[in-house]
């Protein structure tokens, strides 16, 4: 019999024993009580009393009620040391026969298994090894776990299982719990920052008749009552700008977007973003906001502006570099033979792209080719926080043209570690120019560009009522969480990432 078959037999055998224990509990009455009330968390007790010596604890006679999942246990005759884990951390219990009512230790405590959830009332004391411990006087089994934890709870190392059964990952891996606490702090910190700046938080439609605000392939669904196809939103941008037209001059939305595209270490089809819009501001103001926000998050979450990530350390305390797309291509493409003249002539740009092995789509003009060259030769070099600016108008259909060079826009993307983290620009508020750019997007879509934008006539109508000078930005929450948690994959920071169906 193979080792795997033996393991499966042991697993099913242990489940059978646990079910028998549950049946015995049912026979006694309520097998899943809900009367125990906890008054202390493990980490709070450690914070308060780890430095208190044993004699002082004894004098204080501190009574506590703790609850959590059994992580480890070791029995020595008439006493058992148990470690339980709650949302804050772990604490040790000392459960001895002589400290409990008659029969409780032999009938109840000895039947407990790893993974069971228990409630304990007792007093704090220090062991001979000076470990803070709860001496149990009352015990109660709150939930009987029927399935044993992975590898007797020595850890859960299989990556796919960690993603598919996140609850097991959270039980067994402290680092995963820390990651999602950091994610929560990122979201809370962003919300606090914008509310503190006078922005109001809003919610705009997830189901849209016209999916706009970004170049991406949408998910399509059908509304039965209205008998129309609808789309899961790819971005809230066009609705948020309608609100600025309506007089909400500082507005943000922190919510989900959906894009029917590939899955990778950086991409999940369902993801979280903050998008915000500020009237009477331009893209320079938003770059300043972004630097300020990221410094605040770093200090609040890590206590320093130095952010370690993999082999890198990012310094959020320094001003972020600012460089145009053309300058970045010239700077980092020189070793590949790219020269300035290649970026201003369509035929030369096509030839340069071909040398780099870039497959040019029929719908691409000069701007799209320059962008593809940038992605090939320069993007991965933008390691320290860098604002990439002056994107071609062709690939920026919602951004305001630059006053000095209308071929490019007042737009920026934030790159950290060679990855795009955010995208923002001074908004296009010329309704006629916007209509023309939508028409160009429609032509690109007709030519086979699946990610070209749909035309939104109602948005153009809104612009015709007058959008004040405005700038807006979107920041990827998942990628920020990756950054602050030092997580290598986007799946590590999404509680339940998209996975291929297993069956």
Curated annotation (Swiss-Prot):
Mg(2+) 1 binds at residues 413, 420. Its cofactor is Mg(2+). It is an enzyme of class 6 (ligase). One of its GO terms (molecular function) is tRNA binding. GO terms for cellular component: cytosol. The keyword Membrane does not apply. GO terms for biological process: lysyl-tRNA aminoacylation. The keyword Protein biosynthesis applies. Its main location: cytoplasm. It comes from the Bacteria. Mg(2+) 2 binds at residue 420. Its EC number is 6.1.1.6. It is found in: Cytoplasm. Binds 3 Mg(2+) ions per subunit. It catalyses: tRNA(Lys) + L-lysine + ATP = L-lysyl-tRNA(Lys) + AMP + diphosphate. Keywords: Aminoacyl-tRNA synthetase, ATP-binding, Cytoplasm, Ligase, Magnesium, Metal-binding, Nucleotide-binding, Protein biosynthesis. Belongs to the class-II aminoacyl-tRNA synthetase family. Homodimer. This is Lysine--tRNA ligase. It comes from Mannheimia succiniciproducens (strain KCTC 0769BP / MBEL55E).
